[in-house]
């Protein structure tokens, strides 16, 4: 097929549980090749060139509504404006719905961009990005100790990256001008304790899934931020995705933090 195009369309894909809605969707695909697979049933699918743009995309999961103000995607660039992942339920409702402890996320980012090469449609999927940028993100993570503790062993980030099934490499990921807030409560606390990391800037080098033979798999992370809006904090963190033992090294430094600076975290636990 030489060319397929779709212009200014509204499409809703609803499987009964998690509807995906596109508004003002325009798409173009050039030189589409369909061929039978030699060893498996079905058809293989190749696209030489494509371009997709849509506004006000939304997708619901069990606990969240995810939305994008704008998405532009082709085989070399991605632009996402006004990303948000908002809880569908209040904290009190969420606590009643989960059998064991679980984080509740409230996320947004002004813009996410990526440059590189990726193949998302063929049988041999791959992501090889030279740069990913996230600008002005705001992340709130809430955990309640009221539900039972989850006894499962938690996978470290290196193992989680290894679990990605396709080859993926991001040479540089930059998170800029962002805010991270972590809140935690217990059955005895008077509200949640709060840790705030503002003016949050992070660089991640060689984020990967350890699926490309011969390529380095070590990940280096540097973070600079303001801790509790009072003290500079720097963090160096590294791990090797290819290391089955999931070893990691992390160090940090903060200065001039007054004792009262951590009151927002410990005060709710004092009676």
Residue ranges and their predicted role:
Residues 130-142:
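Surface-exposed edge beta-strands and adjoining flexible/disordered loops or tails in beta-rich
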Residues 1-80, 118, 141, 154-250:
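Elongated, acidic membrane-bridging lipid-handling scaffolds
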Residues 85-93, 257:
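Surface-exposed extracellular loop regions of Gram-negative outer-membrane beta-barrel proteins
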Residues 69, 123-124:
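Short, T/G/N/S-enriched strand-turn elements that build extracellular solenoid repeat scaffolds
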Residues 100, 255, 260-271:
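Strand-loop-strand
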Residues 147-153, 268-270:
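Flexible, surface-exposed loop regions and adjacent strand-edge segments
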Residues 91-100, 104:
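A cross-kingdom feature marking solvent-exposed beta-strand/loop segments within repeated
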């Amino acid at each position: 097929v030489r060319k397929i195009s779709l212009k200014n369309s509204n499409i809703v894909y609803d499987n009964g549980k998690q509807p995906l809605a596109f508004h003002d969707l325009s798409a173009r695909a050039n030189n589409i090749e369909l061929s039978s697979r030699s060893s498996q049933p079905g058809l293989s699918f190749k696209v030489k060139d494509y371009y997709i743009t849509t506004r006000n995309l939304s997708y619901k999961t069990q606990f969240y509504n995810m939305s994008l103000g704008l998405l532009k995607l082709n085989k070399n660039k991605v632009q996402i404006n006004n990303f948000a992942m908002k809880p569908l339920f209040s904290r009190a409702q969420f606590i009643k719905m989960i059998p064991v402890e679980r984080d509740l996320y409230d996320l947004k980012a002004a813009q996410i961009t990526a440059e590189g090469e990726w193949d998302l449609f063929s049988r041999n999927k791959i992501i090889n990005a030279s740069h990913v940028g996230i600008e002005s993100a705001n992340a709130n993570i809430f955990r309640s100790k009221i539900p039972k503790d989850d006894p499962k062993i938690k996978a470290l980030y290196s193992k989680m990256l290894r679990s990605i099934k396709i080859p993926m490499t991001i040479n540089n990921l930059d998170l800029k001008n962002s805010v991270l807030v972590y809140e935690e409560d217990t059955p005895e606390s008077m509200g949640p304790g709060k840790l705030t990391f503002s003016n949050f800037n992070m660089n991640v080098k060689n984020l990967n899934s350890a699926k490309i033979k011969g390529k380095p798999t070590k990940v280096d992370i540097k973070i600079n931020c303001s801790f509790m809006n009072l003290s500079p904090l720097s963090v160096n963190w590294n791990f090797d995705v290819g290391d089955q033992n999931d070893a990691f090294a992390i160090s940090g430094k903060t200065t001039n933090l007054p004792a009262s600076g951590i009151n927002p975290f410990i005060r709710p636990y004092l009676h």
